[in-house]
A protein has these predicted regions:
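Hydrophobic positions on the long internal alpha-helix
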Residues: 90, 125-129, 133, 178-179, ...
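The beta1-alpha1 cofactor-binding region of Rossmann-like NAD(H)/NADP(H)-dependent oxidoreductases
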Residues: 42-43, 63-75
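Catalytic loop of short-chain dehydrogenase/reductase
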Residues: 95-115, 134-187
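C-terminal helical subdomain
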Residues: 173-176, 188, 195-196, 203, ...
Length: 245
């Protein structure tokens, strides 16, 4: 597990006002960390902070729409001014679109919205937070991916991924490639960058049809956020270990 610093570990979790993000925040907060609750909806973000605080978590609100440049810049300034650094970034915020979603009937505008949230949003937030992460003794970046983004699993006739996801699945494949590039560029800096596959979790993204709880889905992101300094980087993981690209 992450070697603890003398100061409290500071983490930011995007999309943390509900679902998997909320449980990631709760799990990391249970370690005694100070958790920034990134949320696009200010009111829901404040409610999540209140609920986590009632559970003993040291949480604070970070208004954050990952698709908005000004919002992301403001979030980085807030962390700079109030915390001075960032130890762990969990890019959890995401959008799903429809499912199943055949590529022959995709709405290009809808696809671009998915890419802006699931891929560009991760890049936007990561780049804004990197100066703060570089000040950490044990920096970690965890990106929320999915089994449906794995090309190996998509092309395996024995793997059931629940149908065709012509919009959502490619954004997670794109995110996987982005994570590999970040890990390659940041190798040797101490910043470990990995992708988490939470499994088929019951959230509002799938109409709560998933077979896993949000708490179960949060486990792998928590594990990757607390990797030791000699842990892996540039990988895709679920609860059972590495997932093929």
């Amino acid at each position: 597990m992450l070697a603890y610093m003398s100061e409290q570990t500071i983490a930011l979790v995007t999309g943390a006002n509900k679902g998997i993000g909320y449980e990631i925040a709760a799990g990391l907060g249970a370690l005694g960390w100070r958790i920034g609750i990134g949320a696009r909806d200010r009111e829901r973000g404040a409610e999540a902070v209140a609920a986590l605080s009632a559970r003993g978590v040291d949480a604070f609100a970070v208004p954050l729409d990952v698709t908005d440049d000004a919002d992301v810049s403001a979030a980085a300034r807030l962390l700079e001014e109030n915390e001075g650094r960032l130890d762990v970034l969990v890019n959890n915020a995401g959008a799903a679109g429809g499912w199943p979603d055949e590529p022959t009937s995709l709405d290009p505008a809808g696809l671009l919205r998915l890419v802006d949230t699931n891929v560009v949003g991760v890049i936007r937030v990561t780049n804004a937070m990197l100066p703060l992460l570089r000040r950490s003794a044990h920096p970690r970046i965890v990106n929320q991916s999915s089994h449906v983004g794995s090309l190996a699993l998509q092309t395996d006739p024995g793997t059931d991924l629940g149908g065709i996801g012509g919009g959502y699945a490619p954004t997670k494949t794109f995110l996987n490639a982005v994570t590999i590039q970040y890990a390659a560029e940041l190798r040797g800096t101490g910043i470990l960058v990995n992708n988490a596959c939470p499994g088929y979790v019951a959230t509002d993204l799938n109409g709560f049809s998933g077979t896993r709880t949000a708490e179960e889905g949060a486990r792998i992101a928590i594990r990757l956020a607390t990797l030791p300094d000699d842990g892996p980087t540039g990988g895709l993981f679920d609860d059972e270990g590495p997932v093929p690209w």
